[in-house]
Amino acid sequence: MLFKKIDDINPLILLIDSCQYTNQIMNSYRHRNQTTSFIRKETIDCNIQLPRKIESDLLLSLSSNTDDYIPIINSLSNEDHINILKYTIVIDNVNYLEKILNCTSIDLSVNDDILLCTAIINCSSECLLYLLDKGIPIDFCDNYAIRACCIRLEKYIYTTRKNKSSCDMLKIVIDRGGNVNTHNYEPLYSAVNDNNFDKIKLLVENGANKLSDFKRKITNTNLEIFQYLIDNRVELEVNFDDIFLQSIINDDSECMKLFIELGANINSIPTLELTKIIINARHEILEILINYGLDINNINDKINNEINDNRCEDYDETIKTVELVSNAGIDIINLLKVVIQNALSVYNFTYPKYSI
């Protein structure tokens, strides 16, 4: 059934297109830039940055039951005080944090962003709760807390892994009143792209009601997640053509079918993507496309247009070579099979899985 329909595609123009794209596919669909702009470097790199002797004396005195740390603190600059506070937060030691705050003039209302951001990004739950109890609002720094908790914070953690995970931190933030739909529903978007079902359930159970790709494309597809969102009546404000293409890239046949049923246009697939599917010999994906109504005439037209729109010296050489082979009577269908097999053997094409 599949190959009977495949024969309807003009093999000559498909061979031209396949040959021309073979060397481009290795560099296509690189990982999209998923750097999170609101994650501040100074909240991750948290060394005390003091001379070794002073640092050693300070940590020793902080761990004792004496006040020997006070003269050391008093001899340091305000910048040093901030660095020391950040360090105590990174190691999540509330006792040290309180001692430093009590003997300095640091104003939490002025430095709340750097201190709380450090607590969030390092999953320092005890220090986070302490600072919140001191009156710092949960929506500090443009709702940083809940936005950061919905990405995979563990990859940023500076010190040894703590007992608390970013999901635990998210629960704390939500319990303290964090806005689950802030920034155009960014928390749920981040949790979906992180493929974190626990965070998704936590957000939905606490009022997250829309998945939006308004700011960035959704790169993760997971049938269980999307079925959960649908079952819980979460509005999907997404470009189904884009996410359908992403499911193809992710080799996710089940999500492909779901997105087609939700309204994705199966004929929106670009010719380059179809070429890559064929070059990669991804039989199951191709079979779904055809069985769900891929317009073969439209594909032939697209490939013809692609060839005409990208005419250049190299492309002309490709066309001349393929036409010469065809005119000589060489079996184009079998030759295309060889091209695909050689491409698989030589280049080992793969579709990279996206991660955050």
Curated annotation (Swiss-Prot):
Which windows of the sequence hold ANK repeats?
111-143, 152-182, 183-213, 215-238, 239-266, 267-298
Q: Does the keyword Nucleotide-binding apply?
A: no
Listed as disulfide-bonded, the cysteine pairs are: none
Return the Gene3D superfamilies for the record.
Ankyrin repeat-containing domain
Q: Where is the signal peptide?
A: none
* InterPro entries, A to Z: Ankyrin_rpt (IPR002110), Ankyrin_rpt-contain_sf (IPR036770)
Q: Which UniProt keywords apply?
A: ANK repeat, Repeat
Name of the molecule in the record? Putative ankyrin repeat protein R599
The source organism is Acanthamoeba polyphaga mimivirus (APMV)
